[in-house]
């Protein structure tokens, strides 16, 4: 789960880190009111969980409440990398002396936490690694030992602050908070970029990112609730699929894929790629899928504006071919207004009954997956 910036900053604040005053706004009127409350200039920041907001026009500076209002009218509803802006975080502008980078990740190879620190900030760590790799400091933390003073000293010294200074103490607080968030919230990433030294000499996180392990969300009901209320980085189709109970991942192609089992579904995608097509999605209905689940899966792709062809590839064990066929038939009966072509390869339990049902409604059937994939690609190019 990717937290919005305002949510990540709330965690930083909860763990004792000073951040610039700011509030969340859902309308232009709220933006103006917040700007009046905290004082201008302010920064308007689109709350979408993707990198590169600034370059996409998702971060603006306003000198007056009225300017903030006018800018926000243009920002609400804008599309940034496929995500629609529905929230703006309005925060006090901070004059910056210099920008730094600090993140904490899990290094799976060493089974340790890993701090990445650089005196260069405000750009992606990948860009720093490419242009100035010597500027990146790596500090490993063994979880069985925990964060120690020598870890903190190593990081702060690299960032260029003197022991005993105000900046040293403030940076230490940020490092400690990041580590506690990482552990307490089962995070995969905690990052501040830039970590700024202000003109007043204070060390302040101007941006914050936190990614929490989805498998640990059951331990954090507040985050689970927030995810239900705001799906954030998942599309409307992914949100619907999750609600129904099948595994769905959005891609950028035009051939819809439905399979049973992750391995078969991925192999089906590979076949489509092999024959020159582009999958629109990964959709695994799972083992033993019912007629109802199949119907909802097919409806997702029938309603998807980018999908031209739906390729259903089923190998039935506990998944019955007749149930799959009836699900396809039901979906087509419910979604009458569509222009999609459907290609089916179906084998296994109750195969003959399933094929008979599909033949009655004119669905093309194929004996092997290769021929079915070729046909799907061919139809998508028409």
UniProtKB/Swiss-Prot annotation:
Record-listed ATP binding positions: 45, 52-54, 94, 99
Assigned EC number: 6.2.1.5
Domain ATP-grasp: 9-240
Catalytic reactions of this protein: succinate + ATP + CoA = succinyl-CoA + ADP + phosphate; GTP + succinate + CoA = succinyl-CoA + GDP + phosphate
Binding site for Mg(2+): 193, 207
InterPro entries, A to Z: ATP-grasp, ATP-grasp_succ-CoA_synth-type, ATP_grasp_subdomain_1, Succ-CoA_synthase_bsu_CS, SUCC_ACL_C, Succ_CoA_ligase-like_bsu, Succinyl-CoA_synth-like
Single GO MF annotation: magnesium ion binding
One BP term from GO: succinyl-CoA metabolic process
Pathways involved: Carbohydrate metabolism; tricarboxylic acid cycle; succinate from succinyl-CoA (ligase route): step 1/1
Signal peptide region: none
PROSITE patterns, per database record: ATP_GRASP, SUCCINYL_COA_LIG_3
Swiss-Prot/TrEMBL keywords: ATP-binding, Ligase, Magnesium, Metal-binding, Nucleotide-binding, Tricarboxylic acid cycle
Sites where the protein binds substrate: 260, 317-319
Cofactor notes: Binds 1 Mg(2+) ion per subunit.
Pfam family, one: Ligase_CoA
Cellular component annotations (GO), alphabetically ordered: succinate-CoA ligase complex
Cofactor(s) required, per the database record: Mg(2+)
Record note on quaternary structure: Heterotetramer of two alpha and two beta subunits.
Described purpose of this protein according to its UniProt entry: Succinyl-CoA synthetase functions in the citric acid cycle (TCA), coupling the hydrolysis of succinyl-CoA to the synthesis of either ATP or GTP and thus represents the only step of substrate-level phosphorylation in the TCA. The beta subunit provides nucleotide specificity of the enzyme and binds the substrate succinate, while the binding sites for coenzyme A and phosphate are found in the alpha subunit.
Similarity comment: family membership: Belongs to the succinate/malate CoA ligase beta subunit family.
NCBIfam families on file: PRK00696.1, sucCoAbeta
Protein name per UniProt: Succinate--CoA ligase [ADP-forming] subunit beta
Organism: Pyrobaculum islandicum (strain DSM 4184 / JCM 9189 / GEO3)
